[in-house]
């Protein structure tokens, strides 16, 4: 690290001159595995037992997956902050791996850094996820003899909308990886790190609803709510825990994920999606405990199993985290407040290891000065009973950024034992309303987050007249060879059609994707007569005389039967994307005679599969009596391969049995009229 020239008062991050991402750390080579385990276990576990645990790393080549994940995370935060004009460095310091926390702090101090903002890789407030990090920063400062550096900490970020969105989208993507299953036979199990009951009792900010369990339940409810909002439904969900450690006699949060998975078949569950909302990245606990052990338990229980991704470096999550960092800096300058309900610095007494634990020095807290701790911290180590490994449930079996590797004294409380441990954590929405009566791979309207898009009011769209025409042509005679002449021909024809009052959503180059068609023009209007006028004008234009019609159809938006808030993307404020695929379809006669509940169930499954691909935008319009089809559908996306993926995935749903016709397809790239003409045959 070179001398820091960025500690300028004009930097958006002033008064901070560095951001320090603090993570758990892990071995970066096979040679580091045993030293890492000795460090994590504090010498309390025999060497032969550590050797057994070390074998967990063999399947990863002796390298913890946390390292790559954290490195990418640090880079993502740095890049996002630079977009906001931040020039101060974003660095990494690990508690148990290189680069070590003390080394990072010492290096920063040597280069003149005196005020640091720390971001820990834990979204939730508890001793192991918050206070322990603050204590270890203070201890590292004391060990290094640094007494003139202030380290503040970003508050827990589980409330961040981007964190919720990242987990919701990961969950919807995961639905695509399980076989088609009735909603009532599908279960979502949200998973987080288990902690001792005594740590749960002392977690949070001391206010009702801020404890560890309540934080997770709130996130589960918000993630489930977003999934339900996207396509109108959400399977029943539970909250379970992984990575329990310590003495078997000490109570920890339950149910354990393995035990819970084994209980699901007797509840009629056939498919399960495990969503690790308690973790920010794919580290050892996620990959080993869920991808291997939980997956094996599910297989043994006859369950179809998949695991959703962690939030990782999802763009919305990183953007919100950068916003929290900038907000903290503004608050430190006296220019604003925090963007979350969590106090910064932490309130006195929050997130102790257990309710009566004696505080030791910690940075960024109301009960201890937010400066380097005194020299007496050097020998301070949390006390407690000797660590007793419990089979494969040892804390060092699953090291990760939120691992609880320190033993916990017995809780002074008597935790309530429940006959149904999931009763406090299960969604009440076991009966889910179905989505709309069409083939749209997206559901209820949500305000757009892409800057290209604009919000609309669904009720106004449903109350208005919204029409579209899709007209396909082939080049019958060569276009002019001279560039200016060809450009005038095309631009004049487009302008002449536009004088009808129509809006042109796009020109699409079909060449090569079909042998008999070269152009599709997508027009939209509030009046079908305007669409007809535009078509007549285009056919009579100079360009029109070079073209022959291949296919043309009209559709109109009608409020959906099962989900009135579903809107076609073309009328929902969604900007056109680079690629589009257009096709008609006709349902079978049997479809319309099915009970509404059956159609709703099948469309609900269809919606779960399709809505997981939120990057592909769908516009389904009714075409009854307007031509030979019942529906006209357009799929738009920035990546043509993603449109292919969506169409393939939708072949596996039950509603597909009730489709008689779903061709022809017209697929092409959206281009300007001039670009399209430049690509065509010339005289």
UniProtKB/Swiss-Prot annotation:
Q: How is the cofactor bound?
A: Fe-coproporphyrin III acts both as a substrate and a redox cofactor.
Q: Report the catalytic activity.
A: Fe-coproporphyrin III + 2 H(+) = coproporphyrin III + Fe(2+); Fe-coproporphyrin III + 2 H2O2 + 2 H(+) = heme b + 2 CO2 + 4 H2O; Fe-coproporphyrin III + H2O2 + H(+) = harderoheme III + CO2 + 2 H2O; harderoheme III + H2O2 + H(+) = heme b + CO2 + 2 H2O
Q: Which cofactor does it need?
A: Fe-coproporphyrin III
Supply the EC number(s). 4.99.1.9, 1.3.98.5
Q: Which domain of life is it from?
A: Bacteria
This protein's UniProt keywords: Heme, Heme biosynthesis, Iron, Lyase, Metal-binding, Oxidoreductase, Porphyrin biosynthesis
Q: Name one GO biological process term.
A: heme biosynthetic process
Name assigned to this protein:
Coproporphyrin-dependent heme b biosynthesis bifunctional protein
Function of the protein: Involved in coproporphyrin-dependent heme b biosynthesis. Catalyzes the insertion of ferrous iron into coproporphyrin III to form coproheme III. Also catalyzes the decarboxylation of coproheme III to heme b (protoheme IX), the last step of the pathway.
Q: Where is this region: Coproheme decarboxylase?
A: 460-683
Q: Which GO terms describe its molecular function?
A: ferrochelatase activity; heme binding; metal ion binding; oxidoreductase activity
Write out the ranges of the annotated region (Disordered): 382-456
Region of interest called Coproporphyrin III ferrochelatase, as start-end residue ranges on this chain: 1-330
> Which pathway does it operate in?
Porphyrin-containing compound metabolism; protoheme biosynthesis
Q: Which family would the database say this protein is a member of?
A: In the N-terminal section; belongs to the ferrochelatase family. In the C-terminal section; belongs to the ChdC family.
- Annotated Fe-coproporphyrin III binding lies at 606
Record: residues binding Fe cation: 193, 285
**Pfam families assigned to the protein according to its UniProt record, in alphabetical order:** Chlor_dismutase, Ferrochelatase
Annotated S-S bridges: none
């Amino acid at each position: 690290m070179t001398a820091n020239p960025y500690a300028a008062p004009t930097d958006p991050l002033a008064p901070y001159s560095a951001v320090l991402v603090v993570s758990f750390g892990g071995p970066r080579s096979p040679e580091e595995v045993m030293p890492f385990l000795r460090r994590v276990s504090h010498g309390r576990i025999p060497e032969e037992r550590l050797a057994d645990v070390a074998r967990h790393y063999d399947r990863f080549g002796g390298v913890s997956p946390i390292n790559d994940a954290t490195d990418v995370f640090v880079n993502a935060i740095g890049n996002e902050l630079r977009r906001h004009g931040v020039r101060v460095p974003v660095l990494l310091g690990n508690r148990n791996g290189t680069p070590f926390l003390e080394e990072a702090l010492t290096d920063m101090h040597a280069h003149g850094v005196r005020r640091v903002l720390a971001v820990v890789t834990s979204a939730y407030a508890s001793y192991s996820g918050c206070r322990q990090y603050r204590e270890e920063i203070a201890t590292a400062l004391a060990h290094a003899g640094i007494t003139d550096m202030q380290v503040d900490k970003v508050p827990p970020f589980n409330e961040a909308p981007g964190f919720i969105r990242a987990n919701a989208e990961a969950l919807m993507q995961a639905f695509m990886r399980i076989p088609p299953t009735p909603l009532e036979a599908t279960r979502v199990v949200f998973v987080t790190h288990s902690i001792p009951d005594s740590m749960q009792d002392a977690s949070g900010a001391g206010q009702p609803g801020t404890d560890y369990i309540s934080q997770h339940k709130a996130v589960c409810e918000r993630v489930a709510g977003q999934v339900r909002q996207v396509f109108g439904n959400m399977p029943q969900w539970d909250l379970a825990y992984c990575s329990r450690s310590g003495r078997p006699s000490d109570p920890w949060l339950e149910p354990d994920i393995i035990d819970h998975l084994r209980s699901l078949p007797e509840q009629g569950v056939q498919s399960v999606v495990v969503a690790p909302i308690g973790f920010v990245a794919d580290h050892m606990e996620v990959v080993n405990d869920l991808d291997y052990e939980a997956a094996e338990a599910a297989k043994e229980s006859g369950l179809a199993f998949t695991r959703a991704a962690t939030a990782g470096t999802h763009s919305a999550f990183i953007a919100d985290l950068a916003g929290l960092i900038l907000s903290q800096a503004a608050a430190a300058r006296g220019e604003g407040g925090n963007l979350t309900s969590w106090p910064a610095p932490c309130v006195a007494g929050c997130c102790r290891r257990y309710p009566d634990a004696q505080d030791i020095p910690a940075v960024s807290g109301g009960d201890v000065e937010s400066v380097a701790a005194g020299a007496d911290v050097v020998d301070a180590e949390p006390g407690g009973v000797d660590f007793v490994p419990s089979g494969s449930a040892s804390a060092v079996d699953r090291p990760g950024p939120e691992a609880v590797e320190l033993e916990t004294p017995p809780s002074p409380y008597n935790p309530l034992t429940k006959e149904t441990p999931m009763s406090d954590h299960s969604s009440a929405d076991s009966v889910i309303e179905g989505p709309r009566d069409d083939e749209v791979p997206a559901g209820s309207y949500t305000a757009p987050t892409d800057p290209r898009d604009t919000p609309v009011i669904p009720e106004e769209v449903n109350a208005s007249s919204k029409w579209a025409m899709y007209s396909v042509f082939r080049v019958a005679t060569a276009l002019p060879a001279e560039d200016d002449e060809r450009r005038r021909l095309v631009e004049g024809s487009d302008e002449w059609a536009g004088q009808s009052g129509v809006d042109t959503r796009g020109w699409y180059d079909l060449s090569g994707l079909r042998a008999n068609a070269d152009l599709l023009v997508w027009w939209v209007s509030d009046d079908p007569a305007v669409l007809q006028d535009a078509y007549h004008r285009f056919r009579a234009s100079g360009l029109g005389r070079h073209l022959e019609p291949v296919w043309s159809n009209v559709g109109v938006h009608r409020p959906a039967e099962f989900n009135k808030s579903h809107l076609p993307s073309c009328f929902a404020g969604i900007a056109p994307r680079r690629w589009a695929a257009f096709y008609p379809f006709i349902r079978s006669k049997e479809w319309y005679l099915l009970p509404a509940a059956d159609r709703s169930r099948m469309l609900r499954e269809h919606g779960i599969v399709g809505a997981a691909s939120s990057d592909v935008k769908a516009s389904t319009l009714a075409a009854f009596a307007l031509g030979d089809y019942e529906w006209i559908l357009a799929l738009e996306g920035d990546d043509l391969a993603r449109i292919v993926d969506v169409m393939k995935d939708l072949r596996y749903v039950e509603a597909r049995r009730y489709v008689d016709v779903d061709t022809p397809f017209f697929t092409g790239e959206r281009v300007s009229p001039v670009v399209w003409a430049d690509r065509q045959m010339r005289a």
